Amino acid sequence: MELKKFIRDIPDFPKKGIIFKDITPLLKDKEAFNLAIEKMKDYYKDFDIDYIVGIEARGFIIGTPLALALNKGFIPIRKPGKLPAERISTSYELEYGTNEIEIHRDAIQPGDKILLVDDLLATGGTVKAAIELINKLQGEIVSLGFLIELVDLKGREKLEGYDVFTLLQE
């Protein structure tokens, strides 16, 4: 099954000049969605991982079933004001503006082995901010996993020194 055919391009969303990679057709198709998670599980099955950390919102969609498939817990990184307990935050730039993300201060203990996942690797700004949060909590990032990588935006270059897995490259 060719998973790329389940990714649809939406021009000028969320802003003019941006081509949004819509994963909802992949999510809707149970066989394609299951295959995507299984392929990621196969890559990570022998890694020493304590937790899957997913970045809001589509990182939750990939991270939660992957955590279940690997029999690991899931930790969310969220947009501001969405987490109820004490939290830490950081700001970052993305290809169409700026944003902020947060994590519970007690979510990760020093030395916890983390697989950080998101749906898309573009410029690397969001994942670098998430890495900063995990590092502040002294978690050990084992790998970075993405459903899609936009190769032309060179986000991988910002992630030197990390194991990076992408299921699809565009």
From Swiss-Prot:
Its EC number is 2.4.2.7. Its main location: cytoplasm. PROSITE patterns: PUR_PYR_PR_TRANSFER. One of its GO terms (cellular component) is cytoplasm. The lineage of its organism: Bacteria, Bacillati, Bacillota, Clostridia, Halanaerobiales. Homodimer. Pathway: Purine metabolism; AMP biosynthesis via salvage pathway; AMP from adenine: step 1/1. Keywords: Cytoplasm, Glycosyltransferase, Purine salvage, Transferase. The keyword Cytoplasm applies. The gene is apt. Catalyzes a salvage reaction resulting in the formation of AMP, that is energically less costly than de novo synthesis. InterPro entries: Ade_phspho_trans (IPR005764), PRibTrfase_dom (IPR000836), PRTase-like (IPR029057), UPRTase/APRTase (IPR050054). It comes from the Bacteria. It catalyses: AMP + diphosphate = 5-phospho-alpha-D-ribose 1-diphosphate + adenine. It holds the Pfam family Pribosyltran. This is Adenine phosphoribosyltransferase. One of its GO terms (biological process) is AMP salvage. GO terms for molecular function: adenine binding; adenine phosphoribosyltransferase activity; AMP binding. HAMAP family: Aden_phosphoribosyltr. The keyword Glycosyltransferase applies. NCBIfam families: apt, PRK02304.1-2, PRK02304.1-3, PRK02304.1-5. Belongs to the purine/pyrimidine phosphoribosyltransferase family. It is found in: Cytoplasm.
